[in-house]
Amino acid sequence: AELEAAGKVKAVVTQNIDGLHQLAGSKRVLELHGSVHRNYCRNCGKGFDAEYVRDYPGKVPLCDACGGTIKPDVVLYEEGLDQQTLEDPVFYISHADLLIIGGTSLAVYPAAGLIDYYRGNKLVLINKSTTPMDARADLLIQAGLGDVFGQIEV
């Protein structure tokens, strides 16, 4: 968030669904797999916040408008991403001067394929274990993402 506020980071692209980037203060967070903080009725599409779902008295939260089942706005296994979800990440990645990828094995597609849109020559990979893209990195840091970002001074 501090790097974004300083104009050093244009966007955060994440597969995480927990909303922690926003909690840390990041403003432009592109959530590939959605967020558990947004929920919607599978029948009528009405939106609900996490508190409604958490405080719902029954086991399965139901829509107060139509009685339909409420689902978190997240991509579940075997569900694909729609093209619109990928448009902004592709834009920011393809226009980046520096691309930092961290905390991912680069094994989950289509998210892992977004690296192919990067046209720059400053690719930084930060991950505890090896990834299929390690050889492409200009800087490879084999460490925990939290440890690395904890040492950055803005």
Locate predicted features:
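Conserved catalytic alpha/beta core of Sir2/sirtuin-type deacylases, generalized to analogous enzyme cores
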Residues: A1-V154
